[in-house]
């Protein structure tokens, strides 16, 4: 830990109210003031931390996390508190300068986000919701985005997004579920219009349930509907003539339909796909036609036509023609 200067002053009574003043210089230039009733039940407190600047490197391979002009207010007691946080944060390679404005209430095993506002790169995000970890983990969160640039957080997907996403879920040692009932996003990706709308549900019982999910990216349209699990019935409708820009180092065309039925571990697959100029990282495929069906149980059988030209994966696999 880098050297820091610390100045602490205490006054008052340990049996009634203890007033404190703490000043630090070095890693964190900050002042903490307030009072605490140490002898009372739940320890009532009223604290304020003002930090002009501070930074700390959590790992040698990452840029340090930096904060500036942070004001934190904490009132209530250890079992029922109210927190307000305002300030700036940046660093760790992928966090642009972001203004944070938090208003929250909490108890020993839960926290309620009355409002969390983030502003960065000319965009904003507003989150409200709650989380509880008394018995496993539970959450209920809604995010509203307005021209939010996610490229610093997901470098492979340089998108600017507006709209709403909501999620509820829970997890413990035996069960888990994640419900995303609302996905309604619009914006741009790699200078092309983008929209993603629908809902998704995942759980330990049914791995994936998609009532409907539609991605539009430029002239590309990818729709998914159905379930994956012990009784899979998932339909994919892909009309993607130009995938370039959807993800880093992805290019090519995929058009057609696919269906997955039955047990996920031994599925029946029906497919009719045409692929052209596909490239992703170390994989290249000039052209392919995949049509037919494959049944996995009780034994693998079916009728599948595969025609491909110039398939290459890295330097280890090269095939000129597959028929």
Q: Where would I find each of the regions flagged by the language model?
A:
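Transmembrane beta-strands of outer-membrane beta-barrel proteins
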Residues: 20, 45-47, 83, 139-141, ...
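Sequence/structural signature of outer-membrane beta-barrel proteins
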Residues: 54-58, 92, 148-152, 185-186, ...
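Extended lipid/amphipathic-ligand handling interfaces
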Residues: 4-15, 20-24, 30-43, 47, ...
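Glycine-rich phosphate-binding "P-loop"
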Residues: 1
């Amino acid at each position: 830990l880098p050297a820091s200067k610390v100045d602490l002053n205490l006054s008052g009574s340990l049996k009634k109210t203890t007033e404190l003043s703490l000043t630090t210089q070095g890693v964190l230039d900050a002042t903490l003031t307030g009072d605490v009733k140490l002898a009372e039940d739940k320890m009532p407190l009223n604290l304020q931390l003002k930090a002009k600047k501070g930074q700390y490197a959590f790992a040698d391979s990452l840029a340090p996390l930096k904060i500036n002009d942070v004001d934190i207010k904490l009132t209530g007691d250890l079992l029922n508190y109210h927190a307000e946080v305002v300030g700036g944060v940046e660093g760790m390679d992928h966090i642009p300068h972001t203004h944070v404005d938090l208003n929250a209430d909490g108890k020993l095993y839960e926290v309620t986000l009355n409002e969390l506002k983030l502003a960065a790169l000319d965009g904003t995000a507003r989150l409200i919701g709650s989380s509880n970890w008394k018995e496993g983990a539970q959450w209920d969160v809604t995010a509203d985005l307005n021209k939010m640039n996610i490229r610093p957080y997901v470098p492979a997907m340089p998108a600017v997004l507006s709209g709403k996403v909501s999620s509820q879920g829970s997890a413990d040692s035996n069960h888990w579920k994640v419900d995303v009932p609302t996905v309604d996003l619009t914006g741009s990706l790699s200078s092309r219009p983008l929209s993603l709308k629908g809902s998704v549900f995942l759980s330990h019982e049914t791995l994936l349930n998609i009532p409907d999910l539609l991605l539009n990216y430029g002239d590309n349209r990818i729709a998914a509907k159905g379930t994956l699990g012990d009784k899979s019935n998932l339909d994919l409708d892909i009309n993607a003539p130009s995938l370039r820009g959807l993800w880093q180092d992805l290019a090519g065309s995929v058009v057609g339909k696919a269906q997955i039925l039955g047990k996920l571990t031994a599925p029946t697959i029906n497919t009719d796909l045409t692929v052209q100029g596909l490239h992703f990282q170390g994989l290249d495929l000039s052209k392919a036609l995949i049509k037919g069906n494959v049944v996995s149980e009780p034994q693998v059988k079916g009728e599948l036509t595969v025609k491909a030209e110039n398939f290459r994966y890295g330097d280890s696999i090269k095939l000129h023609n597959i028929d």
